[in-house]
Each structure stands twice: as C-alpha cells, then as structure tokens.
C-alpha cells in the first residue's frame, strides 16, 4: 500500500513538474515572441516535442470549408504551409490511429509518411469554432499525456493570440485607410489640447504638436464653439472654417467633432477630423459654371436644331431650285443648240459667220454639259436618280469611250491606251449611260490635268459570284498629281484642286463628285489609289453588273493558233505604252515573240538595207555577223510590223518607215500604222497598209489577225525571209518591162483627160436620204458597237455628224470611198454658198488629194471651158484647188474676178457709209486696244464685237503676256480679265501702272476690268488695283461701244482736229485751183474726208443692237 502510494505520488509529482515546466515554457514563448506568427511556429515545435509527434501545426478554417495552415513544423524545423480538407469536422479533441480515415490530402501523407492524426479544436471568445491544433505522427500518439486543463489553457491562449493577430491586422488596415484619406484626425481634451494625432496628412493639414491647442489654427472661434457644444450636448457637430497653418498658409476646411468614450462610458477625449475642402469648393464652383454652360449649350442646341431644320428645308429648296432652273435652262438651250446645229449644217456661211455660229454652238453645248451635271447632282442629293438596267455590249461601250477620249486629245502629246483582261465579259446588264458618264468624267479629268505622257485604262474582273461580277477600271495618268492636303476634299462637290483666281484648269468641280456617287449607286466606289505631285495619279472605279452568258473577250477574238511561234515587231518610242501594246497584241498571237524596238533601231535597219542596195545585193546580207537587235527584221517567222506614231513625232518620217517596210517585204507581212485622231486626216487616202486609230481596240486586233491570215501563207519552203523577197524581186523585174510600155501609152491619154476636168457641187445641206453608203464587210460576231461620240473642242457630247463623201467616176480598188467628217470640213468652209468640188478622171495617179479651200473671200471660181460641166456655180467666193491638178488657163479669169469684186466692194462700202439706217462700222482710224483673257471663246467674242464696232484689237492669254505686250506697244485701252492663270488681272494692272510711273509716261493706258462674277465692291476693288473701270460679262454690243468711245474720246477728238485741219487745207487748195465744180475728184475727196471720221456722226452707237451676244 505504502509502495503504491509512493509510486502514485511520484507519478503525480513528475506530472506536476512536467506540467509546470510546460506552462512555464508556454509562458516564456508568449512573453518572448510578441509576433503572432512566431508564436504559432514555436507552439508547433513545442507540441511536437510534448506529444512526440512527427509534425504539428495551427490550421484555420476558411470560407470554402478547407483548412489552411498558418504554422506547420517538425520537431526540428518549420515546414511549408498547405491546405487540406477533412472527411468530417469534429469540434472536440479527436484522435485517429489511421490518418486515412479523416485526412484527404494523400500527397502530404506520402511526403511525410504520416500514419496517425490528432486535432485539438480552437474557439474564440464567443465559442465560435475557427480552427485546430493538429498533430501528425509516424506512430501511435498518446492523447492522455497532458491534463485536460493544460490543453484548455493552451487552446485558450492560442485563440487569444489568434484574435490578437486578427485585431492587429484590422488596425493595420485601418491605419492604411486613414493614411490614404485626404483628412487627418486628432484626439483632444475638453479644453482643446491635443492628446493624440492620427493620419499621414496630419502634419500637412494641422502641423500641431501634442499639448498644443487646436484653436490656435484659426482666427475665428468656430472650432472652440463646437467643442463647447459637443461637451454639453454630446452630439456630432461639423462646421466649415478657414485654417491657418504655422507657415501662414490658409485653406478652407471642414471640421467634424465627436466625443469618444470607453466601454464604461467614461470620456476618453474629443475626436476632431479635419478635411481640406479646397478641391471640393473648386469643384462646386466648376459645377455651378458647368451648369450655366449646360444651360447655354441647351439653348444653343435648341438654336442648332432650329437651324438644322432651316438648313434641311433650304437644302430641299436648293435641290428643287437646281432641278427646276436646270430644266428651265435646258429648254432654251435646246433651241439654241438645235438651231445652231441647223445653221452650221444647212446654211451657206462665210468664214466669219461660220466661226460665230460655231462659237455659239460650242458654248451652248458646254453650258448644257454643266447644266446636266448640276441636274444630275441635285437628283443624286435628293435620291431621285434611278438606274436604267438594260443589256448592253460592255466591251464595245468601253472601247467607244476610249475612242471618244482619244478624239478629245487634240493639242497635247498624250498617249492613250486600253488594256483589258481576256476574261472580261462581253454582254452585261446595267446602266450603260451612267457607265459612259463615269468613264468620260474620269477620262476627261485625266486629259485636263495631263500635259504630256500617257493615260492608261486597265479593265479586270476582281470577283464573280453566280451571275454577278465586280469589274475594276483603273485610270493611270502622268499628270500633275494631287497633294496630300487636297485628297480629303477630292470628292467634294464644286471642289477644285486649284481654286485661286489664277487657276490654270477650269471646270465646275462636279465631275469626281458625280462619278463617286454614281459608282456607289452601281454597287461600287471611286478611290484614289496613289498620287504624287509631278508624277501622276491612279484612280480606280469598281462597279457591279449582272453577266449575260459566258462570252468573254477571249471567246470573241479569232483563233490565234495559226500564229504560233511567230514574230511581231512593234515600233514605239514611248516605252510605257509600248508595253501595253505588246500585251494587247499578245492576245491574238499565241506563243509569239513580240519584240519592242525604237526608232533608232529602224533607222539602223534601213541604213543597212540601203547600203546593200548600193554596194550589192540584199540577199548577200551576212546574218551571222549581223547586229543582234536587227535579226528580228530578217526572221522567217516575222508576220507583222506595227508602227505607232506619237503626237510629237514627224508623221512624214513614220509614213516613210511604213512604205519602206512594205517595199522591202513585198507585202508578205502585215504592216500597220497606229495613229491618233488628230493626225488621221493627214494620211493619204490611197494606201496599201493597215491603219487604226489609237487606242488599240478589239476591232484593231481582229483586223490585224484577219490580214495576217490572208497575207501569210500556211507553209513556206524558204529558210529565211530574204530568200522569199529575192524571189519576188525576180518576178517583179519581169513585169516591170511590160508596165513601162503600158505607161508610155497611158501618158498621152492622161494629158487629154486632164483637160476634161469638171466641176461637181455637193451641198452641205443636201437631203440625207440621198447619201450613198458602202456596206460594211466582215462584221459578223466581231461587230463591236464602238463608234465614238463626237466631242467638239468645247468638250461637250454630240451625236455623230453627217459626212461629205467625194466620189470619182469609178471607185477605187479597195472598194472604199473617201470620207471627211462634215464637222471638220465645215470648220474650213470659207464660202457663202455651196461646196464646189473638182471632179477628176478615174486614174489613181490623178485622184483628188489634200483638197483645201482657199482662204480668200474675194476669189471666184474660174470660168469653165466649153467641154467642162458646171453642176453649180452658186459659191461665187470659194474655189477648191486640187494639189494634183494645175489649171494654168484659169489664172487670168481669177484676176479679173478679183478686180471686179474689189470694185463692187468699194461701191458697197461707200453705199454703207452714206446709209443712215445701217450701223456705223466703216473703216476708221483704229485705236490701239488690247484684250487680256485666258478663255479663247471670250477673246473671240469680244474681238468680233470690237470688229463689228470698227475697232481692231490684239489679244493676250494671261497677265504677264499682256504686261509684256503693253510695254512693247503702249496700248490706249486694255480690257483685263480678273481671273487668269499665272498672273491675274489685278497683278497685271499693278505691273502696268508701276511701269508707267518708272518710265514717266505722259499719258497712261485706260484699263477696264472684266469678270463673269459680280460682287459688291468689285468696281472699288478694280480701281484700288489701278484700273479705271469694271464691267460684268457678257458684254453687250451697245454698252461696249459706249465704253470704248468713253475712254478713247480724248484721243479721237485729237485725231478729229487733225483731220478737220487737213480737210480745210484741202478745201482751200481746191477752191484756189478751180472756181467751179469742174473737178469732181476734189468734191469726192472733200466728201470722203467729211465722212471718214465716224465720231462726227452724232447718232454713233445709239442704234446698236443690245442682243448681239
């Protein structure tokens, strides 16, 4: 018993000592490690030693139901924290010998080789379970090693430390929040002394030390007052005051005051929160200002809404006005154009009358074109323009446009070319008229802004979907280019690249705008792909169409297999268009060798041929040692030579090249000449080579192909081309002797036939039903409807004009009649009557060529012999002369006619001077007048008006030219247009006035400004620029006459005085020499002198017609 008691007491003592030591160690840990994190780590190490476990730790339950260890250690070191889950959660002390029964994290079990698990729950002061003290062992753990009270102590101490850590974390967060707040806090006593300062902004906002009074920061007593109120009323109070810091800086502040008590309701102090409200006050002021602005904006928006409604109404009225006025303008224009065309085509006019009528007609067509543009634009703006969807020949339409643009290029060295892909569809459904309008606008724009170089149209299909296709048309030119600053406004209506008063290029500025809008209506667009000033521009037009059938350009062109492995030479001095021509001819020559050569190579070839002709036989040309660039001319596969003549090249030289090629190759290859429309009329009527107008069309390609089929034999036994030519030479030498004999016999007959010349009259207003037409051949499937629209020099569109055909007694061998465009022939018309054409006999050598009208209004046709037939002699003032026929016997008659007409004209002139009812436009002393205007039509009109009034004038095209002419000739009266390129009227006027002052002119020139635009103050502006007057175009005849008389009156009066003195002297001399009227010459001289000065007529210019222009 005693031994048992002793043993129990020993065990108790040992347990007590162990427990005391454990508690002491625990207390030491708590006091040494103030950081909760270190406390939890040391506690985990202690638990490992006490329970002899492998690992121990502190875990916390998170909101997702998982446990996160905040400390985890082995008996020797700290380990990495981890998360785990339990299969079931027990809030009591629990022990498991098999850890897999409760623990889910297999990776931790394997990593540390754990077998047993024990958990001691942790609860806060409110008995809320929040985590565990966990023990892991690699063997069985003894849960009874510690007393329950000790475990309770440990858990409570751990829970307290955890809450301490939680509060500490919250305090850190609160401090951070207070530091980030733009306010500061302090705790003061009831008398206002600072006890504690809080917040990072404290020093900046208050800067007071502990013990100082809070009232020292304000001059007013606002804070003191509310402190007293808080002490007595125990309420939350706030006020706004101005705080002055120690450094004297002031700022508006909001002060919040509240008394703070402990848990026993004992006052700890008064909390004061100070917040800088400078930004708030500023923001408040800004809000007030913004509110005022908002009210103003609302008012403005209301005004803008009203203005928008007015603008929409005005736009609608404007569109309606444009449509109405354009229609009303078109109605009288239709009459002017129609009657002008009738006047040109049916009336016998002399040169001056024809020029006037043609000017009226051309200007009317130009006005019609501008009016149509305005009407189209107004329709597009009003969304009233509708497309006409019809089937049309797309290829023919494009090539017709190309010919039309080619006709409009008259005086510029521009090469125009079309390049179409062979998969371009033949027939489409769309609006051909709008396609033509777009392409003509784009093409004429390119022509207008290109002075030299090229304009190339490329047509390709960019997409196909079922029966729809999108076609791209690119227009590449070498014009002036477009700057970056102009591109944003390029497609705006009425926009000009150069809108200054000195602009060089005219136009309404609607072309691109209308084209862009029409393209959008047709499912496409117009874009500027690239442009560089001084280099050129590239525009592209994409349009959508519906395709009909599967025919393309490739299917329409003839089979080209016959030309396989053949050679074609193209002569073109312009490399850019030469490459385009090469690609086009490649469309009809399959697997052919197309060689591009320049004029220098052709010269070398003919020099070589000429050298061998002089020194020997052409057959002896050594091809082995020949210059490589000349070898293609002797290639046996050569089938075609195409010669392209450029505008600036000498046409005669290129015609000689063509003729020499034909002569050398003996017509065994195709020789063709490509030429522009302007030079086409200068070609000989009788020719044995193929010719086509540029740009190259599909019809041109077909002609070359067909001629190649006819000329080129299917097989040839000759090894080279020289042998073939030699064989032909031998055959021709045998025939030449026979021809010489025949020519001798024909010479005698020819002399007789030349004496039997006849006159035939072809009336320009003859009935169109009597015209003979030559049926066209070989049309078939190649009939492209590509007749060009006639574009006259004013750039307006017109229908094709009738033609005058000259016929000889027998038709030519070619079966074709010579044709002249009626409009072109009419421009050269100089007669008052019908056309008189000299008809020759049917010999080729004597066929009429180069028929021209003699520019002399007083030459009458010769009297025909008895054996000549006169069909009509109505045109008494016109004579046709053939360059191939000389009529020596008619010269005497012509001289007699001249004398007789001169006599008649003299009598008519005297009669007109003595007539009181006619306009006083007799010959007089002509004042020196200069007209400066950049518009050719304006120059022509004013010059004709002055001529009608009896005055002559010189003309200049810009201000610099006018200034130079004035320096040279010192004109008395200058009509100066205000808007001109290079130098406008105002600058030219200042130059003239400066020149007059520097050179001390005794009298200065009278300068009258001209403009088609009248603005208020225009006359004052002209006077300020040194001019004497200003008038608005168009000028009426009578006001113009009065204006000229006004500024030339002083000079004319001086001339009149001189004339009167001369007349008196003549009269006195006549009276002295004769006492009677026996000398009629003296009387006539006297009368002539008295009537020679038109200004003596008091009714001068009073009866001038007011509607001359």
From Swiss-Prot:
Modified residues (Phosphohistidine): 327
Histidine kinase domain ranges (all copies): 324-547
Basic and acidic residues: compositionally biased ranges: 767-782
UniProt keyword Nucleotide-binding present: yes
InterPro entries assigned to the protein according to its UniProt record, in alphabetical order: CheY-like_superfamily (IPR011006), HATPase_C_sf (IPR036890), His_kinase_dom (IPR005467), HisK_dim/P_dom (IPR003661), HisK_dim/P_sf (IPR036097), PAC (IPR001610), PAS (IPR000014), PAS-assoc_C (IPR000700)
Pfam family, one: Response_reg
Region (Disordered): 739-819, 1052-1109
Protein name per UniProt: Hybrid signal transduction histidine kinase F
């Amino acid at each position: 018993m005693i031994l048992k008691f002793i043993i129990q007491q020993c065990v108790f003592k040992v347990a007590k000592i162990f427990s005391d030591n454990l508690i002491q160690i625990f207390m030491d840990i708590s006091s040494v490690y103030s950081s909760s994190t270190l406390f939890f780590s040391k506690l985990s190490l202690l638990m490992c030693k006490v329970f002899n476990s492998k690992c121990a730790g502190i875990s916390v339950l998170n909101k997702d139901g998982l446990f996160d260890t905040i400390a985890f250690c082995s008996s020797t070191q700290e380990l990495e924290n981890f998360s785990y889950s339990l299969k079931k959660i027990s809030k009591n002390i629990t022990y498991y010998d098999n850890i897999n029964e409760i623990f889910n994290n297999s990776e931790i079990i394997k990593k540390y080789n754990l077998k047993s698990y024990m958990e001691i729950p942790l609860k806060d002061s409110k008995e809320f379970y929040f985590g565990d003290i966990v023990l892991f062992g690699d063997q069985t753990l003894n849960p009874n090693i510690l007393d329950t009270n000790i475990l309770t102590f440990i858990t409570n101490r751990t829970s307290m430390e955890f809450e301490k850590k939680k509060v500490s974390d919250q305090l850190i967060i609160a401090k951070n929040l207070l530091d980030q707040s733009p306010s500061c806090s302090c705790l003061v006593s009831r008398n206002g002394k600072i006890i504690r300062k809080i917040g990072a902004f404290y020093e900046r906002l208050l800067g007071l030390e502990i013990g100082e009074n809070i009232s020292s920061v304000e001059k007013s007593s606002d804070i003191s007052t509310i402190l007293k109120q808080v002490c007595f009323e125990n309420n939350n109070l706030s006020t706004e005051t101005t705080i002055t810091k120690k450094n004297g800086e002031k700022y508006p502040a909001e002060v919040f005051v509240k008394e703070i008590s402990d848990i026993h309701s004992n006052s700890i102090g008064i909390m004061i929160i100070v917040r800088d409200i400078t930004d708030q006050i500023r923001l408040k002021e800004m809000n007030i200002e913004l509110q005022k602005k908002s009210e103003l904006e609302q008012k403005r928006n209301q005004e803008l809404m009203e203005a928008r409604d007015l603008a929409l109404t005005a736009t609608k009225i404007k569109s309606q006005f444009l449509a109405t006025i354009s229609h009303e303008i078109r109605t009288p224009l239709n009459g002017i154009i129609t009657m002008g065309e009738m006047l040109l085509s049916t009336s016998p006019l002399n040169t001056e009358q024809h020029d006037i009528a043609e000017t009226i007609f051309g200007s009317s067509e130009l006005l019609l074109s501008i009016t149509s543009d305005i009407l189209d634009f107004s329709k597009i703006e009003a969304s009233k323009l509708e497309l006409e969807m019809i089937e049309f020949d797309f290829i023919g339409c494009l090539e017709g446009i190309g010919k039309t643009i080619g006709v409009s290029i008259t005086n510029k060295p521009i090469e125009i070319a079309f390049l179409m892909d062979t998969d371009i569809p033949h027939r489409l459904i769309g609006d051909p008229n709008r396609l033509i309008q777009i392409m003509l606008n784009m093409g004429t724009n390119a022509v207008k802004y290109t002075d030299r170089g090229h304009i190339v149209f490329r047509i390709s299909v960019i997409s196909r979907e079922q029966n729809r296709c999108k076609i791209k048309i690119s227009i590449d030119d070498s014009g002036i280019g477009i700057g970056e600053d102009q591109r944003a406004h390029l497609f705006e209506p009425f926009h000009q690249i150069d809108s200054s008063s000195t602009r060089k290029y005219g136009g309404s500025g609607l072309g691109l705008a209308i084209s862009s809008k029409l393209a959008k209506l047709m499912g496409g667009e117009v874009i500027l792909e690239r442009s560089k000033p001084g280099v050129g521009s590239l525009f592209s037009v994409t349009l959508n169409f519906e395709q009909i059938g599967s025919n393309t350009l490739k299917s329409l062109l003839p089979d080209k297999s016959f030309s396989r492995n053949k050679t074609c030479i193209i002569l073109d001095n312009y490399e850019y268009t030469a490459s385009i021509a090469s690609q086009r001819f490649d469309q009809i020559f399959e697997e052919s060798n197309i060689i591009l050569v320049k004029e220098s190579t052709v010269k070398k070839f003919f020099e070589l041929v000429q050298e061998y002709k002089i020194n020997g036989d052409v057959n002896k040309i050594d091809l082995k040692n020949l210059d490589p660039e000349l070898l293609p001319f002797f290639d046996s596969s050569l089938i075609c030579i195409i010669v392209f003549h450029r505008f600036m090249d000498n046409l005669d030289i290129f015609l000689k090249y063509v003729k020499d090629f034909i002569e050398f190759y003996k017509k065994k290859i195709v020789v063709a000449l490509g030429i522009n429309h302007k030079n086409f009329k200068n070609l000989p009527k009788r020719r044995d080579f193929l010719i086509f107008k540029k740009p190259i069309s599909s019809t041109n390609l077909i002609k070359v192909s067909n001629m190649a089929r006819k000329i080129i034999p299917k097989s040839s036994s000759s090894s080279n081309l020289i042998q073939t030519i030699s064989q032909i030479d031998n055959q021709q030498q045998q025939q030449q002797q026979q021809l010489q004999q025949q020519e001798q016999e024909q010479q005698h007959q020819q002399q007789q036939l030349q004496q039997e010349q006849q006159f035939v009259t072809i009336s320009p207003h003859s009935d169109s039903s009597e015209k003979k037409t030559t049926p066209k051949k070989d049309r078939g499937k190649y009939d492209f409807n590509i007749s060009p629209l006639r574009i006259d020099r004013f750039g307006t569109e017109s229908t094709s004009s009738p033609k005058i055909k000259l016929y000889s007694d027998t038709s030519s061998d070619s079966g074709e009649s010579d044709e002249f465009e009626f409009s072109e022939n009419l421009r050269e018309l100089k007669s008052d009557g019908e056309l008189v054409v000299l008809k020759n006999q049917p010999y080729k050598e004597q066929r009429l060529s180069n028929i021209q009208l003699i520019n002399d209004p007083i030459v009458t046709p010769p009297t025909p012999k008895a054996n000549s037939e006169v069909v009509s002699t109505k045109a008494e003032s016109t004579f046709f002369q053939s360059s191939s026929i000389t009529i020596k016997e008619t010269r005497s008659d012509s001289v007699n006619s001249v004398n007789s007409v001169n006599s008649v004209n003299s009598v008519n002139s005297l009669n007109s001077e003595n007539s009181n009812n006619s306009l006083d436009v007799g010959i007089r002393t002509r004042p020196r007048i200069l007209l400066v205007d950049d518009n050719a039509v304006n120059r022509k009109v004013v010059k004709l008006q002055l001529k009608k009034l009896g005055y002559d004038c010189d003309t200049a095209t810009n201000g610099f030219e006018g200034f130079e002419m004035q320096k040279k000739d010192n004109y008395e009266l200058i009509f100066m247009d205000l808007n001109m390129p290079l130098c406008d009227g105002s600058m030219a006027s200042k130059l003239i006035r400066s020149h007059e002052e520097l050179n001390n002119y005794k009298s200065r020139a009278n300068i009258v400004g001209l403009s088609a635009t009248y603005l208020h103050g225009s006359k004052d502006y002209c006077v300020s620029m040194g001019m004497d007057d200003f008038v608005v175009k168009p000028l009426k005849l009578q006001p113009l006459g009065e204006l000229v008389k006004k500024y030339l009156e002083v000079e004319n009066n001086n001339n009149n005085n001189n004339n009167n003195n001369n007349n008196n002297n003549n009269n006195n001399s006549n009276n002295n020499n004769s006492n009677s009227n026996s000398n009629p010459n003296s009387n006539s001289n006297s009368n002539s002198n008295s009537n020679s000065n038109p200004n003596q007529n008091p009714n001068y210019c009073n009866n001038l017609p007011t509607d001359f222009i």
